[in-house]
Amino acid sequence: MRTRTFRFACAGLLAAAAVAIGFALLRASRAVQRASSETAADAAIPFRVIHLDPGRSNLEPVAAPAVFRDAVLFQGSLYLCGPGGLIQYDSEGAVRARFMAGPDLPAAPVRVATGAAAGSGEPELFVATAGEGLLAYNGRAFRHVRPNDAAYRDLTAVLPLATGRVLLGTAKKGVVVYDGERLVPFHAAFENLEVSVLAGDDANLWTGTVNDGVLHWRAGAVERFGEAEGLPDPHVLSIVVSGDAAYVGTPMGVAEFAGGRFRRVLAEGVFAESLLVRDGALEVGTLEQGVVEVPLTPARPRPASRGAELLPGKVERLLAIDARLYALSENSLYRIGRDGAWERVLDRGAAVLADRNISALAFDSAGRLWTGYFDRGLDILAPTLDRATHIENDHVFCINRLVWDRERNVTAAATANGLVLFDAAGRERQVLRREQGLIASQVTDVAFRGGGMVVATPAGVTFLDGAGARSLYAFHGLVNNHAYALAAAGERLLVGTLGGLSVLDNDTVRANYTTANSGLRHNWITAIARVGDEWFVGTYGGGVIRFDSSGRWSRFPDLRAPFEVNTNAMLATEHAVYAGSLRGGIYVYDRASARWHTLRAGLPSPNVTALAARGGTIYAGTDNGLVRFPEDSR
């Protein structure tokens, strides 16, 4: 499909929505204000306003594919957002600006909308983020509305109102309202909801949830609709309001409401990811069926697919620009051409990485960075990081660990479907599974030793050497069968498991440690790093604990709050120890000062899943991309 530029009239972009000032709207507006003020005195949510300075981070991202989730027109440009950040396109389809999650924005955007907040005096682009609250952009600068409580920072929806208030949907805390000065819960009926979408206005507000159907607010009254009231599914994906009608999209079709009352189900069985009312029809963006058009006639509507070809992937958003229908997928923007067929008008551009969700990192002797993905195989990046060779097949798809063996100059990929060995040229040479002697085909870690290697699996560990394969599990004294992490030094081997740590000497279990007989706070051992004559042991929920060769455990006094260390996301260098966490970024232990601190600013995600080092540079993989930074700037 040929990529084309797109043009749209400035009048269509800059037209301001007319503001109704009748009695009904005034009454509804006062109801919204009253609902907010009733909770403001005793339920105000503390927050800070931060003025962002994009581009000041010293963390450098490696080009990853853009993924689109939402789009909106603002000040003559089209803005597309997704996990990678916010991209501004001009009317010719050229990129005018990129604001990347991490270096420029504090978190990944999830939704965008335009409006004017009370006190701002000008239209703004509002960006709801996953974990860092609300961003407001006036075309020149960003301000960051950041609640102190992390639960209120995890946003899922944003809806600016004509009154100057901005409604925010959260993942766990329901709906809150920001008026430029205060942040408060919207209404008691909307607290603690898992909000998925917001639509409507002061007089007619619809709130979709993840599992509890849809709530309708009308002039101060609230009504909930679930499956018993006609909704085809309690999981609400999308909502569009048109006059007195509302359409609520679910994975099993669209519920039509008229005057606040359920009327009928449209497009039954269709996964309604996005909705748009246009020219007397309901356009439904689906998961795998492209765009389905449903005529809105009194007779029973018959859905029909839009365009001669189905759009690839999920349709995230539908837009009408200059009377033409546009569909946003995760990797492109399409529109219906004059001939009725879909044409691509924007693409996500070139990228080095095949995916954003990184699970493992390792360097080989040639300085190439092996990058594993959770479900996309692996890339072998050139030392310049400007190109990559992608490998993905039945065995190389879900990468748990990558390890380079200096002695043999081979790289091992521990995957969900075996241990795959590659030669120095990056060619696949051998696949080891249960049929080849492993105790299980799913491999979680691998450690090379002088005479062979040790393979960790959910069923125990397997030793491979010149004598063949032999396995060890709970029957032989292993503290737990499910092994996650390995670390070897001489004849000593540490095996981190779901149930504690086993210490082996000469392949025999010498000691087991759990919360019952050691300083461990959690039994689940996720990562182990050799630091001098000691070991730093990462746990899932208990942070990092020090373990010495005599079997003594000691906690770090400056690591008081518990945290989750991701599986095998630990790295020790001459100067520091790095631990990738689930929510807190990178925990950094300075070996000179013996103190910990955290590194989060500039990361594309606080979920750090893999770490590697080379030439004084640290490489950090996350579930939203890869960055690098000089170790001396840690």
Residue ranges and their predicted role:
Residues 2-634:
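Carboxylate-rich, polar loop motifs that coordinate divalent cations or form catalytic acidic clusters
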